[in-house]
Regions:
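C-terminal outer-membrane/trafficking sorting elements
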Residues: 412, 438, 487-495, 500-557
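Short, solvent-exposed loop/turn segments enriched in Ser/Thr/Gly
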Residues: 393-401, 442, 449-460
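Residue-level detector of functionally pivotal "anchor" positions at catalytic/ligand-binding pockets or at interdomain
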Residues: 374-385, 476-495
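Beta-propeller domain segments
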Residues: 85-87, 95-97, 163-322, 330, ...
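Surface-exposed binding patches on compact interaction domains or structured appendages
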Residues: 377-378, 407-445
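Acidic, Gly/Ser/Thr-rich repeat motifs that build Ca2+-stabilized beta-propeller blades
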Residues: 24-167, 213, 217-225, 274-314, ...
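Terminal connector regions
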Residues: 452-479
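Bacterial Sec-dependent N-terminal signal peptides
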Residues: 1-25
C-alpha cells in the first residue's frame, strides 16, 4: 500500500481580531473527562459525579475533579458488540437515590442471535444489582437499536426502539420494532396506552437516537434517515411517523398518498437532502446562557456538530438553526444539561463511523460547552508549507496538513479547495466549514489519486474567517506503477456502472474474489469475498447496513 507522509518545513503565526473571534463562535469546549470508549449516555448527579455508559459494556461513575472511575456495572462479557450494539442508554428514577433504580438498555449475546434488552437495576453499595428485565426483543440485529429513555412526571418510562433494520416492522402494531414504547416503572403496561395491553405509544420510526420531554410535557425525538431527511418529531399518543414509506415532509406524490392514507405526522424539522446522523437532544431554557434559551440542543454524529434549534414563542415551529463548533471534536453522541444550565457533551470517535484525523489520543472525551472569554482571539499558525505524498497509479493515498490555533478563542476555517491543475489531487476535507478549538492542532486531509506515473505538484488553499487572503500550501505527489503487475484486472467486469442499487463483479473463471469499496476520502464503505466463485455482488449499502449517498466510490478487486 502507498505510504502517506508529511514533512514540516516552516511555521508562521497570524493573530485574528477580537471582533472576528466573537463573530465566529460564542462558545468553546473544555474537556472534563478523557480515555472513554464510545460513551453512549451521560448524566451529572447533584454531587457533580458523571454517570456514563460505554458501548463496550461498562457503566461507571466518574469524579471529574480527580478522574477516578468507579465501575458500577460490568457487562463486557455479556453484551453483543457488533456494529452498533453494546451497552446503550440509561435513565435514573426521578427520586434517585431515595428510589435507587436505574434503567439501562443493552444488546445481549445469544446462542443463535442477539437480544435487545431494557432492564431495571438497583443501586446498592456502589454497584448496580438485581436486574429486572422489562423489555426483550429477540434477533435484535446489529443496527438501529434506539434505547434512549425518559421518565415522565406521571412516572411512565418512555423508550425509543429502532427498527433493528426490519423496516417493515415499523408499521406493525404487534411488533416492538420501530416504535416509541411506554411502560409503568415496574415494567407493566399503562392502562391509558393507545393499544390495550401493548407498550406501543407511537409507530413508524426508523432509529430514534434522541428523546426529550419539555417542561410543558411535550415529547420530541431525533431520528435517523437513510441518505436524506433526518427528523425531529413531536410525539403524540398513537401517532404514525411514516417510516418506511415516508422520510421527512410528505413531499413526493408517493409519500403524499401514503401520508394521507395512514394519517402520518410530519416532522417539525428535518435535514433535507442530506443526513446529519442526529443523536441525543435536550431542551435548554435556563438563565445561564440566554442566547440558547427556548431551544432544542441536538448533537450529530455524521456532521460532528452541536445544533441549536430555536423555537418560536409558542414552541410550535423551529424558526432558526444554529450550528455550534462544527467538526471541531469529531463525532458527537450524547448531551446532558444540568439543573443549573451547564451543558456537557461526549464524543464517539472510536465507533465504526470514525474519520480522520480522529480519534485523538485522549478520545473519547466528555466536554463542557463554555463561553469564549471576553476579548479572546484566535491565532492561526502554519506548521508546514508542503505536503508530500507517495502512491501507486490508481490507488488512494492521503496526506495531512497540520495547522494550529494558538489563541484563546475558536477559529473558523470557512472553506478549503484544491487548485486541481493536474487532476491527480483532491480535497480530502469535505467537512467544512470547520472550527479549530483554542490551543489545538488540526490535521487538514489531502488526497492523491494519480492517473499515471511521475511527480506532480498542486496547491491547497485554506480560507480562515477574518482573513481576506487564503493560506496556500504546496502538494507534491509521486506515483509509481504497481510493483507486481496485476493481469487479473482485465478479467473482471463490473456491472451495472453507474448503478442505482446492486453492483456485480464477475470473473471469467472461478476463483477467490475479494472486493473493497472506499469513498474518495478513503473511508471503508464495504468489503466482501467469495471462494471458488465467478461473481460477487455489493448491495450498495455500507458495511453497517446504511445507505450510500450518491457519488463516486473506489473499488479494489
Amino acid at each position: 500500500m502507498p505510504l502517506a507522509i508529511t514533512i514540516a518545513l516552516c511555521s508562521a503565526l497570524l493573530v485574528l481580531s477580537a471582533v472576528t473571534a466573537r463573530a465566529q463562535e460564542l462558545f468553546t469546549y473544555k474537556t472534563v473527562v478523557t480515555g472513554l470508549a464510545i460513551p453512549w449516555e451521560i448524566h451529572v448527579d447533584d454531587d457533580g459525579m458523571f454517570w456514563v455508559t460505554e458501548r463496550q459494556g461498562l457503566f461507571s461513575r466518574i469524579n471529574p475533579k480527580t478522574g477516578e472511575k468507579k465501575v458500577v456495572l460490568d457487562l463486557r462479557d455479556f453484551v453483543e458488540l457488533t456494529i452498533e450494539n453494546g451497552m446503550l442508554g440509561f435513565v435514573m428514577h426521578p427520586r434517585f437515590p431515595a428510589e435507587p433504580y436505574v434503567y439501562v438498555g443493552y444488546v445481549l449475546k445469544g446462542d443463535t442471535a442477539s437480544k435487545r434488552v431494557i432492564s431495571r437495576f438497583l443501586f446498592r453499595n456502589d454497584s448496580l444489582v438485581e436486574p429486572q428485565q422489562l423489555v426483550g426483543i429477540d434477533s435484535a440485529g446489529n443496527i438501529h437499536q434506539g434505547s434512549r429513555m425518559v421518565i415522565t412526571p406521571d412516572e411512565k418510562l418512555l423508550v425509543t426502539m429502532g427498527d433493528g433494520d426490519w423496516a417493515e416492522k415499523a408499521q406493525d402494531p404487534s411488533s416492538l420494532r420501530g416504535k416509541l414504547l411506554r411502560f409503568n416503572l415496574d415494567g407493566s403496561i399503562p392502562e391509558d396506552n393507545p393499544i390495550p395491553g401493548s407498550p406501543v405509544w407511537s409507530l413508524g420510526h426508523r432509529n430514534q437516537q434522541g428523546l426529550v420531554m419539555l417542561p410543558d410535557g411535550r415529547i420530541f425525538t431525533a431520528e435517523h434517515g437513510t441518505v436524506i431527511e433526518d427528523e425531529v418529531n413531536e410525539i403524540f399518543k398513537g401517532g404514525n411517523y411514516g417510516w418506511p414509506f415516508s422520510e421527512g415532509p410528505c413531499d413526493t406524490p408517493e409519500e403524499k398518498d401514503s401520508c394521507k392514507k395512514y394519517s402520518v405526522i410530519e416532522p417539525v424539522w428535518s435535514t433535507g437532502e442530506a443526513t446529519y446522523g442526529l443523536s441525543e437532544l435536550d431542551f435548554y431554557d435556563h438563565d445561564l446562557y440566554p442566547v440558547l434559551q427556548n431551544s432544542l440542543l441536538l448533537v450529530s454524529l455524521k456532521q460532528s456538530t452541536l445544533y441549536q434549534l430555536k423555537f418560536d414563542s409558542t414552541r410550535s415551529r423551529i424558526v432558526q438553526t444554529v450550528p455550534i463548533l462544527p467538526f471541531a471534536t469529531g463525532r458527537l453522541r450524547a448531551i446532558h444539561i444540568t439543573k443549573d444550565g451547564r451543558i456537557f457533551l461526549s464524543t464517539s470517535n472510536q465507533d465504526q463511523g470514525k474519520y480522520e484525523p480522529f480519534p485523538r489520543p485522549e478520545d473519547d472525551v466528555i466536554m463542557e460547552l463554555v463561553p469564549v472569554p471576553e476579548g479572546a482571539t484566535p491565532v492561526y499558525r502554519s506548521i508546514q508549507d508542503t505536503v508530500i505524498m507517495n502512491g501507486m497509479v490508481g490507488e488512494l493515498s492521503f496526506g495531512r496538513l497540520p495547522i494550529a490555533n494558538d489563541g484563546d478563542a475558536p477559529m473558523t476555517i470557512e472553506y478549503i479547495w484544491i487548485d486541481d491543475r493536474t487532476g491527480n489531487f483532491f480535497n480530502g476535507q469535505w467537512r467544512q466549514p470547520l472550527v479549530v478549538l483554542p490551543k489545538t492542532q488540526m490535521d487538514i486531509m489531502t488526497g492523491f489519486l494519480p492517473k499515471a506515473t511521475g511527480s506532480f505538484e498542486d496547491r491547497v488553499n485554506i480560507k480562515v474567517m477574518g482573513i481576506d487572503s487564503p493560506f496556500v500550501y504546496t502538494l507534491i505527489g509521486t506515483a509509481i506503477a504497481s510493483s507486481v503487475p496485476d493481469t487479473r484486472v482485465a478479467e473482471v467486469t463490473v456491472y451495472p456502472n453507474p448503478s442505482s442499487g446492486t453492483v456485480t463483479f464477475r470473473t471469467v473463471e472461478p476463483s477467490r474474489i475479494g472486493v473493497t469499496i472506499r469513498d474518495l476520502m478513503g473511508r471503508l464503505i464495504w468489503t466482501g469475498s467469495a471462494n471458488d466463485a465467478t461473481s460477487l455482488t455489493w448491495d450498495g449499502l455500507t458495511f453497517d447496513a446504511g445507505s450510500c449517498a450518491p457519488g463516486s466510490y473506489h473499488a479494489v478487486v
